[in-house]
Amino acid sequence: MDPILVLVLTLSCLFLLSLWRQSYERGKLPPGPTPLPIIGNILQIDVKDICQSFTNLSRVYGPVYTLYLGRKPTVVLHGYEAVKEALVDHGDVFAGRGRLPVFDKATNGMGIGFSNGSVWKNTRHFSLMTLRNLGMGKRSIEDRVQEEARCLVEELRKTNGSPCDPTFILGCAPCNVICSIIFQDRFDYKDRDFLNLLEKLDEISKILSTPWLQVCNTFPALLDYCPGSHNQFFKNYAYIKNFLLEKIREHKESLDVTIPRDFIDYFLIKGAQEDDNHPLKNNFEHLAITVTDLFIGGTESMSTTLRYALLLLLKYPHVTAKVQEEIEHVIGKHRRPCMQDRSHMPYTNAMIHEVQRFIDLVPNNLPHEVTCDIKFRNYFIPKGTTVITSLSSVLRDSKEFPNPEKFDPGHFLDENGKFKKSDYFMPFSTGKRICAGEGLARMELFLFLTSILQNFNLKPLVHPKDIDITPMLIGLGSVPPAFQLCFIPS
């Protein structure tokens, strides 16, 4: 038989098999657009604005639908009811971490953010317990954050009211808090190694939100065979991990099991106590990836939120004025802010919540995965299926937040000006995979922002109406545009 004819017949059979398989799977899964072989529904998604693509598809197929990202079926949950029903009401089933190939390759299934099964359960339980032992939610952590807020204010004073890009100054403060928790140390804001570390973190954040990375996560083979920014991501990730591995080696040499100093010490002590088959057993690589997860999550997300908060306060000076008036009334000029103040500052609390709602930092959450077969809203979702939960659709729900595209602290105030909570507020996700550092993040946002506004007036370089608050990138995260401002001592 003609070899060319054999090749054509083989390819035709593979094509038909692919169509049949997708048709069979689609018959069980929630409805969705018809996928093309190999590439799936990728042409129906704008990689520069995935959120809008998901919203458009939800209008056609409802709040629970299936997309094929490449050949892999992915269930998308859109809107508060669907997200809450999955992550809270069926929390155990939806607690798996879906595949994110760029992180799968970097972490090799270890750490706290991208692991699954017993590795994830043991690591998360240990991490939460250790963070509590180190003072999470207690006065000792608050003291650390307050001290770092003081250092941040002093560093901002050194700008002498001149225009500056706040990116790295705002990154130093949360990074130092994480450093103090992980290896009981902090850095001077001008330390070259420290700034290099922050540059790597900032670059990671930007790379993860590029359209190219979204394509790579859909077609993982590109990670191994194509040039691109993903290679820089792996270099930066390895740099941070190796930096932390060196800290781990130093801790191993100076460890006193009777007096654990920090997260690394607690992990080393725990690892020595466990059985050989336990995931925490003397595993430096696992420890390094765990603290790298905490490092990236605790530094870059907070730095980005603080940066975006200042941009919004520049854009809306009437909001800034109200916050500063409340600071003056409750705290005054000479006492440093503390967490007890928050309950007496409803407008400031509302402003911080509105910043997090409006910037929509991780629009589509990190992917989840169902840990067993489940019948969800009369649809069958088989074990191992990746699930995307659109946090953007929750944070921008017009029924809960009128005019959701408008920045308005009133979204979190009642008719009497008192702060009001909302079940729809889930920037940290919700359920079993909710951010482990949520409490610390809330504390940092309040203490850092109130400390800045207590000591400085924010001066933009252009008229507020000309300030662009459109994200520079929207991918895994939302990245604010670059800007400069002046910190004028008040």
Curated annotation (Swiss-Prot):
**Residues with the Phosphoserine modification:** 127
One of its Pfam families is p450
Q: In which tissues is it expressed?
A: Expressed in liver.
Where does this polypeptide localize?
Endoplasmic reticulum membrane; Microsome membrane
EC class: oxidoreductase
Name the catalysed reactions.
Answer: an organic molecule + reduced [NADPH--hemoprotein reductase] + O2 = an alcohol + oxidized [NADPH--hemoprotein reductase] + H2O + H(+)
SUPFAM superfamilies according to UniProt: Cytochrome P450
Q: What is its main location?
A: endoplasmic reticulum
The terms describing its cellular component in GO are:
endoplasmic reticulum membrane
Q: Which GO terms describe its molecular function?
A: arachidonate epoxygenase activity; heme binding; iron ion binding; linoleic acid epoxygenase activity; oxidoreductase activity, acting on paired donors, with incorporation or reduction of molecular oxygen, reduced flavin or flavoprotein as one donor, and incorporation of one atom of oxygen
- Sites bearing N6-acetyllysine, chain numbering: 252, 375
The prosthetic group or cofactor this protein requires is:
heme
The record's listing under Gene3D superfamilies reads:
Cytochrome P450 (1.10.630.10)
**PANTHER family referenced in this protein's UniProt entry, alphabetically:** CYTOCHROME P450 2C29-RELATED, CYTOCHROME P450 508A4-RELATED
Similarity section? Belongs to the cytochrome P450 family.
Q: What name goes with this protein?
A: Cytochrome P450 2C54
| Organism of provenance | Mus musculus
